[in-house]
Amino acid sequence: MMQHASPAPALTMMATQNVPPPPYQDSPQMTATAQPPSKAQAVHISAPSATASTPVPSAPIDPQAQLEADKRAVYRHPLFPLLTLLFEKCEQATQGSECITSASFDVDIENFVHQQEQEHKPFFSDDPELDNLMVKAIQVLRIHLLELEKVNELCKDFCNRYITCLKTKMHSDNLLRNDLGGPYSPNQPSINLHSQDLLQNSPNSMSGVSNNPQGIVVPASALQQGNIAMTTVNSQVVSGGALYQPVTMVTSQGQVVTQAIPQGAIQIQNTQVNLDLTSLLDNEDKKSKNKRGVLPKHATNIMRSWLFQHLMHPYPTEDEKRQIAAQTNLTLLQVNNWFINARRRILQPMLDASNPDPAPKAKKIKSQHRPTQRFWPNSIAAGVLQQQGGTPGTNPDGSINLDNLQSLSSDNATMAMQQAMMAAHDDSLDGTEEEDEDDMEEEEEEEEELEEEADELQTTNVSDLGLEHSDSLE
């Protein structure tokens, strides 16, 4: 009783000595800790010199007791119900397929604010540090709920697009179609139909069917009186709620078993299903492979027209090859091989027909108004014209009057064109690559002949004009 009679001197002595207040504890502990300071204060008043040399002993703080006190402070905070509600929403968003939207939490916040205002309850406590902790915790859970909503939307979008892709590429008719007759063909007796008596008499047969690693169990109720139609089976599977069962049917290990298996079931072999799916997925590759062989006529017409329009330089660039491939719906390799063969089978006979006598190496050309019948560079023709004085003299028939060149008559040109068209008509130019040793030898011989022609032209005083004849020859 004497200890509680004089609280004022004790508070004044604590204020002068700047002793920190004891931590928050329960009332029994506070009474127990409050007694030693009062005794110490009484000693301090009676003997001040003794207390100056010895410090005041502080009571040890139990970490477990401090943790429990902090927990009770969080539980008693006014914002704790809102924090609990948000935490439960985050758990619901991660447990089920239906994610809790952030808009619903906004409604919950409004309801919480109205309830606090109606009950005249505060939103914060006397501890600013604890208030800041609660607000930050609510913000973190709010951000977490938003991220869960985004992830759920992405998952739903991916599933919808994947299911749509499966429905378009794996049609039911293609899935069960078997041209050679498979184990699940309607005309084959290998369909294992389990009768009603067998299922009723042997309850273990159901587990044997469901655990069979060689097949996929499909409800027989989806079939219409024995007519196997995968469209009905597929619709039954989708309408049953298991949207991912078609994906499981593709695998060789997984099985699709409905929850309520009917009395009759049909068993489909996984190996045959995988075989049909593989052939279905490789259908596009087979179509592309079927293009090898005879090329379409419209494609050859487009490439032949380009060839005759560029007789001066019948070597398309990479961009021109891509453009021609896009127009003809062919591959770049087919276009490249066609031009390789065309230069040998179409243009080479034209050159041979224009030069019937192989003895003279120097070739004569016609006038400039027919450049499409030339298969030589412009620099050689320009050099010869400059040698004759800049203005070529023409004969009455229109040919250039040059002694060292042989004239290209219209009869020879017509004969060459006919021979080239007949060769092109007989051979379809299938685009297959024919890079053998004979082709390489022919190209080397053509290059040697062109080099010899250039040397002979240089001997006829054409070399002083600085001709560059190798830039346009390949």
UniProtKB/Swiss-Prot annotation:
**What GO molecular function terms would the record report?**
actin filament binding; actin monomer binding; DNA binding; DNA-binding transcription factor activity, RNA polymerase II-specific; RNA polymerase II transcription regulatory region sequence-specific DNA binding; sequence-specific DNA binding
Q: Where is the MEIS N-terminal domain?
A: 96-179
**Record family assignment:** Belongs to the TALE/MEIS homeobox family.
Q: List the Pfam families hit by this protein, alphabetically.
A: Homeobox_KN, Meis_PKNOX_N
Where is it predominantly found? nucleus
- Which compartments is it annotated to reside in? Nucleus
Polar residues compositional bias, start-end: 26-38
Q: Which domain of life is it from?
A: Eukaryota
Keywords recorded for this protein, A-Z: DNA-binding, Homeobox, Nucleus
Tell me which CDD domains the record gives. homeodomain (cd00086)
UniProt DNA-binding residue ranges: 291-350
Q: Which GO terms describe its biological process?
A: regulation of transcription by RNA polymerase II
Its lineage reads:
Eukaryota, Metazoa, Chordata, Craniata, Vertebrata
Keyword field contains DNA-binding = yes
Q: Which SUPFAM superfamilies match?
A: Homeodomain-like
One Gene Ontology cellular component annotation? Answer: actin cytoskeleton
Q: Which residues form the signal peptide?
A: none
Segments carrying the region annotation (Disordered) are 1-42, 351-371, 385-405, 423-474
Write out the biased-composition intervals (Basic residues).
361-371
Q: What is this protein called?
A: Homeobox protein PKNOX2
Acidic residues bias (residue ranges) = 429-456
